[in-house]
Swiss-Prot record:
Belongs to the MnmA/TRMU family. Catalyzes the 2-thiolation of uridine at the wobble position (U34) of tRNA, leading to the formation of s(2)U34. The record marks H160, Q369 as: Interaction with tRNA. Transmembrane segments: none annotated. It is an enzyme of class 2 (transferase). It comes from Maricaulis maris (strain MCS10). This is tRNA-specific 2-thiouridylase MnmA. CDD domains: MnmA_TRMU-like. Pfam families: tRNA_Me_trans, tRNA_Me_trans_C, tRNA_Me_trans_M. ATP binds at A41, M42, S43, G44, G45, V46, D47, S48, L67, G159. InterPro entries: MnmA-like, MnmA-like_C, MnmA-like_central, MnmA-like_central_sf, Rossmann-like_a/b/a_fold.
Amino acid sequence: MTTDLTGRARAQADDLISRLGLAGDPLGLGGNPGDHRVVVAMSGGVDSSVTAALLHHLGYDVVGVTLQLYDHGAAMAKKGACCAGQDIYDAKRVAEACGFRHYVLDYESRFREAVIEEFADTYLAGFTPIPCVRCNQTVKFADLLTTARQLGAVCMATGHYIQRVDGPNGAELRRAADAGKDQSYFLFATTHDQLDFLRFPLGHLNKDQTRELAEAFGLIVADKPDSQDICFVPNGRYVDIVEKVRPGASRPGEIVHVDGRVLGTHEGVIRYTVGQRRGLKIAVGDPLYVVRLDAAKAEVVVGPREALEIDTIALKDINWLGDEAPLDGAPVRVKVRSTRPPVPAALSVDGDDIRVVLARGEEGVAPGQACVFYSSDDEDRVLGGGWITSTSGGSGGSSGVRLIG
């Protein structure tokens, strides 16, 4: 069965689509859906496949695009990867079964430069990167949007769990209805111009509803497992990627207590992140955690759990999605990790310098991660965010990172 359904199967699919609030023109383009060409970014997973099948079923002129991002043996065959061999094949089979055009674009060189090399360099500098945000920020929501426009599309749709709403001052980004699947943390860097062109038709669904749609359309990926966060890291061994991309760049050094005592040695700061407890390989009586990393001195600084607490976060490369410019002292809610809920904070604004002052201390906030802003009045609305460069205050003092060079 495909999305070219007839009789009872089509009636059942139409009923499900209606119950899920997806009937008619879920992209909000107006007019006849068939007059609108929509590029769908297809990773080969169930979410993007359902997005493409749904829009095709509703009559939009769908063009599926899958990016070939990397090609190394273990990742090509591993379960839970995306944009590699099996996933490209799955995306192509979905498109063929549904009857819409599908293209595979070779972005491997661009992905290596913008994501993989940046991933390695970030670890070497003592930061903890989020490659999925960089991929969205550069490859998917910059380069691919340009390609979509060249293909004559009026918008690009993805299978992300996030909501785009037309507000009084333009398009707004909002958290997904399913808090457990919400991907707003990874999409904070989406710009106003990109948001105008993007659509997220699954944003108000949960995963069970998405899989129900996949089954109604008869998609071969209906039971496919979700993709993992870092698609290009085989078996979760990110250190292997860093050493392959930058051979010999990681230096051994000392593990130092916050009180100045040298407790042991390590094989490179790339093996550690702020908040880490396991794998320190030092014999001490009390539990110790990584408090900060000094890449210039090749030091891993450790301390008791209370030394992890901070209350001030310095940021760079801020993307602001609010209606008005950020004001000094403005209340917001922020997420400092994807799995943590938004917490109360205030912005400290001095010209182009913006810091976040938390209402309560947070532990394990790592430079290199994202700090994402949400409205204090409506915490579902995403106001943007920035990259964490350093932290201070609380019981933990400063955990800024000294850059190499």
